[in-house]
């Protein structure tokens, strides 16, 4: 008798559950954060002032997630309404050295970082005497180190306070199931505190078990959030694809935050493109033999949150719905309306690639590509769904 196949252990995902997740734009003052926010949202919110705290309260915007599949479906169905997937982006006030102790807008800044689920970290890699750097000169490695150090200090302080509370509870000695759970939590958080204070590495870089990740997720630690590094160069450097700071920044990320994404870009160039129509912007990029990095930045942020999308399609509307990786069919249906989840019967599912290949829904059915899926079906990015629900 052949040995039983071991069931694959599903890795617990970092971060909050749910699909309404947010990215925050983080960096030192005057590195291009607010200008980047204005470019990514194509909104005119007034020029950011040339001083450290131009953005006192976080600005929020929803940006459409570029998706060629969605564009094709809209062309195929020609619907009256087209609703893409969206990514929520916050512009957060600049961090300064000492933020963890309340310097500048430190406490407000760190609370805003805690409220987001992923980070776009804008790193200044351009020289400009007219744009003051809060530290006096341009040094991307120093800036990177300041930010990670401030986040690590705040995480360690938060974990230490949490541990103090747990120790008081577990010292009472009661041998209940609740107490056993608290002792397990304490042991994990002791390990987390040791990791933060001894390795000086972001918590997301540690090797953690599923149970440990669950406990860490409950703490909303700053260094548990995925980070995408946006290296803001001058337009000249971006167009010639050469920058004196870039190799040093890449080396720092490889050594201190291995595996994190680095995207070279020019905020000045991206902002200039927003002054054009779409056709003019495309023509300008062709003329300069380059392209906007905003689509890549948005998609990378969306993916960093472990988000995927599925579609509902018809003559009235083509819509992209955001869900987390690993979402099952009833919960995916529930994103449209909670009744669809509660009274879920089945989903009729075909995949975008099959519709693209076979061209019509009828051809997909004839080829056996339009399938009925039940409650245990795990959604895939690019699924096209028609939900059937019963009476509650």
UniProtKB/Swiss-Prot annotation:
Residues 21-285 form the OBG-type G domain. Its cofactor is Mg(2+). Mg(2+) binds at residues 34, 55. Pfam families: MMR_HSR1, YchF-GTPase_C. One of its GO terms (cellular component) is cytosol. Keywords: ATP-binding, Cytoplasm, Hydrolase, Magnesium, Metal-binding, Nucleotide-binding, Nucleus. Residues 306-389 form the TGS domain. It comes from the Eukaryota. ATP binds at residues 30-35, 233. Its main location: cytoplasm. It is found in: Cytoplasm; Nucleus. InterPro entries: ATPase_YchF/OLA1, Beta-grasp_dom_sf, G_OBG, GTP-bd, P-loop_NTPase, TGS, TGS-like, TGS-like_dom_sf. One of its GO terms (molecular function) is metal ion binding. Monomer. Belongs to the TRAFAC class OBG-HflX-like GTPase superfamily. OBG GTPase family. YchF/OLA1 subfamily. Hydrolyzes ATP, and can also hydrolyze GTP with lower efficiency. Has lower affinity for GTP. Negatively regulates the G2/M transition in the cell cycle. This is Obg-like ATPase 1. It comes from Schizosaccharomyces pombe (strain 972 / ATCC 24843).
């Amino acid at each position: 008798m052949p040995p039983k196949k071991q069931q694959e252990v599903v890795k617990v995902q970092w971060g909050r559950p749910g699909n309404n997740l947010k990215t925050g734009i983080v960096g030192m003052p005057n590195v291009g954060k607010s200008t980047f926010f204005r470019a990514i949202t194509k909104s005119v919110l007034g020029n950011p002032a040339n001083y450290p705290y131009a953005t006192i309260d976080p600005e929020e915007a929803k940006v459409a997630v570029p998706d060629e599949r969605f564009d094709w479906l809209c062309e195929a169905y020609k619907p009256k309404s087209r609703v893409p997937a969206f990514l929520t982006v916050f512009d957060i006030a600049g961090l300064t050295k000492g933020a963890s102790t309340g310097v500048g807008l430190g406490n407000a800044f760190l609370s805003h970082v805690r409220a987001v689920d992923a980070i776009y970290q804008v790193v200044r890699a351009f020289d400009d005497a007219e744009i003051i750097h809060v530290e006096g000169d341009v040094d991307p490695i120093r800036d990177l180190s300041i930010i990670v150090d401030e986040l690590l200090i705040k995480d360690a302080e938060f974990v230490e306070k949490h541990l103090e509370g747990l120790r008081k509870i577990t010292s009472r000695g009661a041998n209940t199931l609740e107490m056993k759970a608290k002792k397990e939590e304490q042991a994990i958080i002791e390990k987390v505190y040791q990791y933060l204070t001894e390795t000086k590495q972001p918590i997301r870089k540690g090797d953690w078990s599923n149970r440990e990740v669950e406990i860490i997720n409950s703490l909303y630690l700053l260094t548990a959030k995925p980070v995408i590094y946006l290296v803001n160069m001058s337009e000249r450097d971006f167009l010639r694809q050469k920058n004196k700071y870039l190799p040093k920044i890449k080396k720092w990320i490889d050594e201190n935050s291995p595996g994190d994404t680095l995207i070279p870009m020019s905020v000045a160039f991206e902002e200039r493109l927003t002054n054009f129509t779409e056709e003019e912007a495309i023509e300008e990029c062709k003329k300069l033999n380059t392209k906007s990095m905003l689509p890549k930045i948005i998609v990378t942020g969306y993916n960093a949150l472990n988000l995927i999308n599925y579609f509902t399609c018809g003559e009235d509307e083509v819509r992209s719905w955001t869900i987390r990786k690993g979402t099952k069919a009833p919960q995916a249906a529930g994103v449209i309306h909670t009744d669809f989840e509660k009274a879920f019967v089945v989903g009729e599912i075909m995949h975008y690639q099959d519709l693209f290949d076979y061209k019509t829904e009828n051809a997909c059915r004839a080829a056996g590509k339009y399938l009925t899926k039940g409650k245990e079906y795990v959604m895939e990015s690019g699924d096209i769904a028609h939900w059937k629900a019963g009476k509650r």
